[in-house]
Amino acid sequence: AYEIRPRDWSSDVCSSDLLNRVVSLFRQRGFAIDSLAIGRTHEAHISRITIVVDGSKTGVEQVVKQLYKIIEIRKVSDITDDQRVERELALVKVTSKSATSRAEIMQIVDIYRARVVDVALGSLTVEVTGPTDKIDSVVGLLRGYGIKEMVRTGVVAVTRGAGVAADSSKLHVVA
C-alpha cells in the first residue's frame, strides 16, 4: 500500500525557463500539482521551484530520479518529513457595499493579521500571508461578502534551523 498525501518539492535550478520541463515530468506521471511557486534565490541566476503534489512516496522518488537527469537542476529536496516554515500569499478583492460590511471585513482582517492593501468604492482588497490553512480560513470567511477576484501565490517553504534542505543525504519531501 502506498501512502497518498501532498508532497512538497524544492528544486534549485539554473534558469527559470526549466519550469515547463519540470512540470511536464510530474504531469507525464499523472501527479496532480496542488501548488507551484518559482522565484529567484539569494544566488545570482538561480531560481527555486516549490511544488506540492499529491502522490505516493515511491512515485515521487521516480520523478526525483528523472529531475536529476536534467543537467541544469542543481539539487532536489523532498522536505515532507522535515521541520519547515511554509507560507503562501493571497490577494482577495471583496465586495463591500456598506459601512457594516466594511467593519465586519476589517474584523476578519484584524483577527487573521491580514491587511487591506486597496480600498475602492464597493470593494476592499485584502492581503493575507501564512500557512495554507490560514489562507483557506480567511477566504472561506470572505466568501460570504462576495469575492470579486482572488489570486494565490502557491506555497513556498524552507527547512527550520541552521541547515539547508540539500545539506542532508536523505531525500526530503514536504507534506
Could you say what each language-model-derived stretch is?
Residues A1-W9, V13:
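Single conserved hydrophobic/aromatic residue that forms the stacking wall/gate
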Residues S10-L18, K93-T100:
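Short, surface-exposed ligand-recognition loops at beta-strand->loop->(often short) alpha-helix junctions
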Residues V22-F26, Q62-I70, E104-D110, V138-G144:
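Short amphipathic alpha-helices in soluble, non-transmembrane regions
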Residues I33-S56, I79-E86:
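Short, charge-patterned binding micro-sites
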Residues L36, I71-R84, A114-A120, G146-R160:
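Conserved short beta-strand edge segments in small beta-sheet-based binding/regulatory domains
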Residues G55-T100:
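Helix-adjacent hinge/juxtasegments
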Residues V85-I108, T129-R143, R160-A175:
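Short, low-order "capping/linker" segments at domain edges
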Residues R102-E127:
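Strongly charged, low-complexity linkers/loops
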